[in-house]
């Protein structure tokens, strides 16, 4: 009973992370306008830079050690704010008017580029440099939107992102798959879009996770600008 109480107390340690996350930049190009049965189709391409705190080489806070100095429990002093690698994405978005509703769907792929780090070991007592390669991700979604007036619309959609396993390679070693790093993150989304002017809109999006890999909920704000 004493041991169980000690273990429970150790598990209550809490850390957080503040700071700049990964910065992304994307551009859209309209391939086709809506005509007859054909939806408006937009090509999207973008890149994400690893400007946030990477989840590798973090400083650790050791909470408990055994009598032989073996670490029983440790947590990062600060949580990561990014994934640590460069990423590029390409996708298609389609919109079709079905008065009074608007139907939309999207499909895309995210590619992650390998990157080296001074330490990729999860043991705070060791330093092992190496490379990390995140698995590619396929994302897709579909939904419907209703316009309240010329400026405001409400949308309801489903989105999913399926990611392959990541791989790591210690310096001088071979690539090895990371067990449990694959994911299937699906969510139900509720959004409100408000047109600020002819070129700029404000998008508010609330997401509710549907799978274990998805966050319980997310809240995002975007301000797209159209030339």
Predicted regions, residues:
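Short, small-residue-biased leader/transition segments that mark boundaries at the very start
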Residues: 2-3
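Transmembrane beta-barrel architecture of outer-membrane proteins
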Residues: 20-26, 40, 85-89, 135-139, ...
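Transmembrane beta-strands of outer-membrane beta-barrel pores
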Residues: 22, 31, 47-53, 96-100, ...
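Membrane-embedded beta-strand positions of outer-membrane beta-barrel proteins
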Residues: 27, 41-45, 90-92, 105-107, ...
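Transmembrane beta-barrel domains of outer membrane proteins
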Residues: 28-30, 91-97, 145, 193, ...
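Short loop/turn motifs that connect adjacent beta-strands in outer-membrane beta-barrel proteins
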Residues: 32-41, 54-57, 100-101, 151, ...
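Surface-exposed loop/turn segments flanking beta-strands in extracellular/periplasmic regions
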Residues: 62-75
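Outer membrane beta-barrel transmembrane domains
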Residues: 116-227
